[in-house]
């Protein structure tokens, strides 16, 4: 589906799974919060969120120079703030329960669930 991730055309609790591939680093911080909130809204209780995106500074200090240079060299206006705002913290703040994280350089995978109750 291609649509506005901040206002998805689904009812509350309609979906079992929501996925995102390389979206969050393209968004300003405020939009990342809004999209995470919207993902929670459309998921059924116990539903899963699966996100694949660029690695962040929390994954490895060894990657810092590579990741910070990437933003400048690839004209990524929101990448610098994305690097410093861990997705795990974002999803937790919006109400998700973290299930799994994995680093697959230069990417990260985050799996979280909407609480059942």
Give short role names for the model-derived ranges:
Residues 110-117:
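C-terminal lobe and adjacent flexible extensions of AdoMet/dcAdoMet transferase-like proteins
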Residues 6-18:
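A short acidic, Gly/Pro-enriched loop at the edge of an enzyme's catalytic core
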Residues 33-45:
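A short glycine-rich, Lys/Arg-flanked "PGG" loop and its adjoining helix->strand segment in the class I
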Residues 33, 48-109:
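C-terminal alpha-helical "lid/dimerization" subdomain adjacent to the S-adenosyl-L-methionine
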Residues 16-30:
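A short SAM/SAH-binding and catalytic strip from SAM-dependent methyltransferases
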Residues 2-7, 106:
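Conserved SAM/SAH-binding loop
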Residues 1, 19, 50:
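Conserved Rossmann-like nucleotide-binding pocket used by diverse enzymes
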